[in-house]
């Protein structure tokens, strides 16, 4: 190659390139993208001519094959080439063999491939067939190739690199200090990067860059990915806004339905009140003698009448149960002496004079009709456990307040009379005590005579019941 006349080679090589331009790969270079400028076309032509002159026909054929593989025109072949390059790289990086071992293996593989090729296809027949086809036919690609070829990509990259070098030279002339600082920073960065990352990894990154950059550059994958991501983001944005509006509408509709349902439930409950089965059973089980007649009142409760008798305020049938209930509940209250003693002893424990008996009887007789009316009115309504207790407590409170007011008035009148008159003599006190003793003895003798005469058991029980009730009231009033 080191001949003294390089111009001849140049003149001989240039026509060869011009003659070889009708090859199948070269017209594709002329059909570049519409966006490529004339400078890129000229640079691509110069690169192809230089490669043809320097490397020759076989190397140029390999370059075309590499162009097809790296431009990913045929994705399957490009993918297989990518996998093969990765396997070869890691085999060379991890194998313990020496360099000459690898060279010998490569030569041996080449020889085997050539032998197989000669055995399968005759060289002469193949050459003759190829000549006949190339002379009589010309392969034309009917599909216009809109993707830029690898030569265009290389030419564009070379132009960008040359522009970068021109700008850097201009920057060096304008500010040499900043340029020196920038170069030192870049060198320091790569030094630190090489100390932390092995050279094998950097070489593998260069291999990936060589395969993937043409893929993204020639096929406009970046622009396609950007357009798809943008459309997805727009759909997502619109979908989120629509979803929020739909949720708001559903919430407002649910609130309207809930308010309408509450209003309908209120109207329905007002028309048809609910009745508890337990309360109805208690109301039906009030009467023990006859079947009770159930009637519906205005306030939504049951009205019971015992034995089909008319309900009047002065009915004896209603007075009798009220007295029985009152006496039964009074017998359950505890008393201090459990009914022992006499009525006189209870009256003495109160400290009230005997003259108050008639006044108490008058007050009791005055309050009895009102109590009877209350008891009759209470039985006309359904008697629950809480209502019965409330009624009994009201009756007991009325009796106690009446007795207390009478006792306080009498005590005040007695105190005024005592202040107005002189103090009583000791003889009078002894007379009153003897009179009280006589009355106590007389009452005890009467009780003994009644027990000896053998009164009926019912009368004795009634007497005992009256003693207990009077004893309870007297003890309660005495406590106050």
From Swiss-Prot:
Annotated GO CC locations: cis-Golgi network; endoplasmic reticulum; endoplasmic reticulum membrane
Basic and acidic residues bias spans: 1-10, 317-331
Sequence ranges on the Lumenal membrane side: 65-78, 123-191
Region of interest called Reticulon homology domain, as start-end residue ranges on this chain: 67-216
GO BP terms, alphabetized: autophagy; collagen catabolic process; endoplasmic reticulum organization; mitophagy; negative regulation of neuron apoptotic process; reticulophagy; sensory perception of pain; white fat cell differentiation
Location, primary (coarse class): Golgi
Post-translational modifications: Phosphorylation at Ser-134 by CAMK2B enhances oligomerization and membrane scission and reticulophagy activity.
Motif (LIR motif): 436-441
Polar residues composition-biased segments: 302-313, 454-473
Transmembrane residue ranges: 44-64, 79-99, 102-122, 192-212
Any one Pfam family match given in the protein's UniProt record, by short name: RHD_RETREG1-3
Residues modified as Phosphoserine: 132, 134, 136
Membrane disposition: Multi-pass membrane protein
Family annotation (InterPro entries): RETR1_RHD, RETREG1/3
Family: Belongs to the RETREG family.
Domain comment (free text): The LIR motif interacts with ATG8 family proteins and is necessary to target the ER fragments to autophagosomes for lysosomal degradation. The reticulon homology domain provides capacity to bend the membrane and promotes ER scission. It is required for homooligomerization. This domain does not show relevant similarities with reticulon domains, preventing any domain predictions within the protein sequence.
Subunit structure, as described in the record: Homooligomer; oligomerization is enhanced following endoplasmic reticulum stress and is mediated by the reticulon homology domain. Interacts with ATG8 family modifier proteins MAP1LC3A, MAP1LC3B, GABARAP, GABARAPL1 and GABARAPL2.
Protein name per the record: Reticulophagy regulator 1
Gene name in the database record: Retreg1
């Amino acid at each position: 190659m080191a001949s003294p006349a390089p111009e001849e080679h140049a003149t001989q090589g240039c026509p060869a390139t011009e003659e070889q331009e009708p090859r199948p790969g070269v017209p594709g270079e002329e059909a570049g993208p519409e966006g490529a400028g004339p400078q890129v076309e000229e640079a691509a032509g110069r690169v192809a001519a230089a490669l043809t002159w320097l490397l020759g026909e076989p190397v140029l054929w390999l370059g075309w094959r590499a162009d097809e593989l790296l431009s990913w025109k045929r994705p399957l072949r490009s993918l297989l080439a990518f996998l093969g390059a990765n396997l070869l790289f890691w085999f060379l990086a991890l194998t313990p063999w020496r360099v000459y071992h690898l060279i010998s293996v490569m030569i041996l593989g080449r020889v085997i491939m050539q032998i197989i090729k000669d055995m399968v296809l005759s060289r002469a027949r193949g050459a003759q067939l190829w000549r006949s086809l190339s002379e009589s036919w010309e392969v034309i690609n009917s599909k216009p190739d809109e993707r830029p070829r690898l030569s265009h990509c290389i030419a564009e990259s070379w132009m960008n690199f040359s522009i970068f070098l021109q700008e850097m030279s201009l920057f060096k002339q304008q500010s040499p200090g900043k340029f020196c600082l920038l170069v030192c920073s870049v060198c320091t960065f790569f030094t630190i990067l090489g100390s932390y990352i092995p050279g094998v990894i950097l070489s593998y990154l260069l291999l990936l860059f060589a395969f993937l950059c043409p893929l993204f550059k020639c096929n406009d994958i970046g622009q396609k990915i950007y357009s798809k991501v943008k459309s997805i983001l727009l759909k997502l944005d619109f979908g989120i806004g629509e979803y929020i509006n739909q949720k708001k509408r559903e919430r407002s509709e649910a609130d309207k339905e809930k308010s309408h349902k509450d209003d309908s439930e209120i109207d329905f409950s007002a028309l048809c009140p609910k009745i508890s089965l337990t309360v109805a059973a208690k109301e039906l089980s009030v009467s023990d003698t006859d079947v009770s007649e159930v009637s519906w009142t205005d306030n939504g409760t049951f009205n019971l009448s015992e034995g089909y008798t008319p309900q009047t305020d002065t009915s004896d049938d209603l007075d009798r149960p009220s007295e029985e209930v009152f006496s039964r509940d009074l017998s359950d209250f505890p008393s201090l002496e459990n009914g022992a003693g006499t009525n006189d002893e209870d009256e003495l424990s109160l400290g009230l004079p005997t003259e108050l008996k008639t006044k108490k009887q008058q007050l009791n007789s005055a309050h009895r009709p009102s109590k009877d009316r209350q008891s009759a009115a209470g039985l006309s309504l359904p008697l629950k456990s809480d209502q019965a207790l409330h009624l009994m407590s009201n009756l007991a409170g009325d009796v106690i307040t009446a007795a207390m007011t009478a006792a306080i008035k009498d005590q005040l009148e007695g105190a005024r009379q005592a202040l107005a008159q002189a103090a009583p003599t000791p003889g009078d006190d002894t007379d009153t005590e003897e009179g009280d003793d006589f009355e106590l003895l007389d009452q005890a003798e009467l009780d003994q005579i009644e027990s000896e005469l053998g009164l009926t058991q019912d009368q004795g029980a009634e007497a005992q019941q009256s003693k207990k009730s009077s004893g309870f009231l007297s003890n309660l009033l005495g406590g106050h």
